[in-house]
Each structure stands twice: as C-alpha cells, then as structure tokens.
C-alpha cells in the first residue's frame, strides 16, 4: 500500500514549515511566488492528495516555538519552567510539538532574531514572559509566523495575548487586607517595570481609593530596576505600614526575610500577601496568602489561540484575561 504523502513530508524536503506548505497549496498570501511554485511542483511529484476537511483536522500537527528571555528563566526559574511544561502538555493534547529557545539579553538588545524563526523550524510562536517592544516589533515586521504572547501584553503591538487578571487579583488582595482591619497598606514592586506589576499596582490603588485612602509614595517600594527585572535590595520605610501587597510570591518572600532581619515578625507585626501561588520550597518560612495564577488554563488558551491562527488566518482576537483564585493562608493577621 502506497504511503500517504502529508504536507509535513513536503515541508521537510524543502526545509520550510508546514504552514508555508499549507498556504502555498491553498494559494494564500505570505509565500513568495518562487517558493509557491516549488511547493506545488514537489507536491505533484510526490503524489500529494489534499485531504478532506475532516481528515485534515484529525491529522494536522504543528511545531510550536516558545521563546523566553534568559533573565526570566534565571529569576523566575520554577514558575516559567512550570508554565513551559503546561504549554508542552497542551500542545501534545493538540497533536503538536514544542521547541524552547532561551533568548539571551545581548541578542535581544542587538535585535538578533530567534534561531527558531531564522531557521524556519516552527509553524507558530508563543512568546513567554515578555520582551522589549522594539524586539517584538522586529519579529512582527520580519516574520509572518502566527504569534501569541503569554503572561504579558504590549499595548504598542496588535497581537493576541493571554494574561492573568493582575488588576483584579491585586484589588482582591488589598480589599482582603482592609477587611482584616488594615488601614495602612504598602505596595512592593517597581511600577512601570513590567505590565503585570503596573496592573497589580493599579488594582491596589483602586482598593485604596474605594476605602478613602491615598497612595503614600514612601510605602510604594521598588524591587528592581526600571529596565525590566534586575532585582535590587529595597529599604523598608521609616514609618511602617501594617501590611504589604507584593507583586509576586518571590518578592513577598524577600520582604518577609527583610522584615525578619529588621526585627519584625510576620504576621504578628506586619502582614504580607503575594501573587502567583508559586514559590519553591525553602524561600519562605510561613504559608503565604496569595492570588493563584491558573497556569493550566492560560497555557491551554494560548495553544488553542495559536492553532486557530495557524489554521484560520491572521485575525486578531485581542487580550484574553484568565481569572485566578484567592488563597488565604497564614501571612495575614486581623487587627
């Protein structure tokens, strides 16, 4: 019995992606005339027959690239490795495969494209964690690869993105502290360093305003430089609030260590809440109240969107907010 020729077989022969072959055979834009002619000629020579729509849906598989900046892997190693594993599992469920590229800071600064794109190894791309706008624009301008942003967004670039509801999560945490009797509440995170920190800060501010409070600048503590995420030592204010809302669990654990080092006990003297519900063992000596990010749903949504883009055109669906879950533990005291 003769072997059934698939689009992936043609793609392998010409060292292009399956999406390129699909576009060429269906006369879609995004493929040069020369490459289109090569693909069609080879398809005839190999005896390729276009499958029915039902057969195509069942058999189609894709190579999905994931790029993540190296500083995210270094600083948030466990969180982003877990997110990558979730992407992997979501891809396997959709008959697809994932390849990871860690982008170093020098290549990002020099606008050197990812190898996965330069070598045409992938059919679609998930950008995980965030890259500088200039780099994202370079990718969008030079490559027609379907793309989804995961765990960040960039308002300067029209692209599909999947993010946790940072604003609502931080708003919920701050409201919880007010409900526990706290009136003097600080925030830890460098505002404008990342979109997620800024959104979490704004959720904190909304709660303050609704409770008749204004922001005290000395209670908003930077935790990193403004470039993005080179962490820096922060100084506690002279006049202390009774609670801190932290932009992530890792930073919350650092705040708790600094408080303990200075002589404060958590939650007896100061209450602390985090964000993410992802903290590897040994970083914190107390179970932390936090807002859990739904990594499974975020990853599944990103893969589903990307596959839809790879099979159904380039129409943008915008931002997808994935709700998380408030988790009460032992890092907050009622006063």
PLM regions: where:
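Hinge/beta->alpha junction and helix N-cap segments in small-molecule ligand-binding domains
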Residues: 69-82, 100-108, 162-172, 188-231, ...
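Short acidic/polar active-site loop segments enriched in Thr and Asp
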Residues: 17, 49, 123, 182-185, ...
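Flexible loop/turn connectors
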Residues: 231-335
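Alpha-helical recognition/docking segments in bacterial nutrient-uptake
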Residues: 1-5, 59-175, 234-239
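Short helix-capping segments at alpha-helix termini
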Residues: 93-94, 208-215, 238-239, 261-266
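Short acidic capping loops at alpha-helix termini that bridge into adjacent secondary structure
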Residues: 183-184, 215-218, 266-272
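N-terminal helix-turn-helix DNA-binding module of bacterial transcription factors
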Residues: 1-60
